Regions:
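Conserved hydrophobic/aromatic beta-strand scaffold that supports enzyme active sites
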Residues: 9, 29, 50, 59, ...
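Nucleotide phosphate-binding site architecture
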Residues: 11, 18-19, 33, 58, ...
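Active-site donor-binding loop signature of nucleotide-sugar glycosyltransferases
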Residues: 34, 62, 75, 123, ...
Length: 181
């Protein structure tokens, strides 16, 4: 379960916070008992791609926790000052060393229990030269039947890949929205 009461100390003065509903609000917030600062917590955006070369999809084997050693699509946390598309391209370059051309937003997945929103773009690889970064053990292309389904790191990756291959079989790609438990 997601811990909604994570802010223990004020980011302004360092004093202890208390959770209560501020005036003119409808949700509990962390409020500083000393300076009155109200702290808002919002979901984090995870951005990534489904990089494709012909009939193959590029996956990365994680060199970091959580889920060390398991396979994932190239993705990571969006940074301030970038768009979701820019973040997806950056993460693909950082994790796989891959150059891509985005082809449109593909999945938007709400992962409420961990306070995240995952956005994956379809992407075309510009070549097959990969240079995995420090967060990746290896980057490898897989045909659908070769995907290590039992070794995927995250449910959002599984959902995205399943929807990608289903759409590809139908000959058209749609935007998929879902809530992941």
């Amino acid at each position: 379960m997601f811990d909604m009461h994570r802010i223990k100390h004020c980011r302004v003065c360092g004093s202890a916070t208390q959770y209560r509903v501020p005036a003119d609000d409808n949700r509990e917030r962390a409020i500083c008992g000393a300076c009155g600062e109200i702290h808002y917590e919002n979901p984090l955006n995870v951005v990534g791609t489904v990089p494709v070369w012909g009939e193959q999809v590029l996956l990365c084997r994680r060199n970091i926790e959580p889920r060390y050693g398991l396979w994932t699509l190239p993705a990571g946390f969006m940074e301030l000052g970038e768009t979701t598309a820019e973040g997806a391209v950056r993460e693909t370059e950082e994790e796989a060393g891959a150059r891509i051309e985005l082809q449109g937003l593909f999945t938007l997945l709400n992962v409420v229990r961990v306070g995240q929103v995952h956005l994956f773009y379809r992407a075309r690889l510009q070549d097959t030269q990969f240079a995995p970064g420090p967060e990746t053990i290896e980057a490898q292309l897989f045909h659908e039947q070769q995907i290590p389904w039992d070794q995927l790191a995250f449910r959002t990756v599984r959902e995205t890949l399943q929807r990608y291959f289903a759409d590809r079989r139908q000959g058209r790609f749609e935007l998929h929205l879902a809530d992941i438990g």
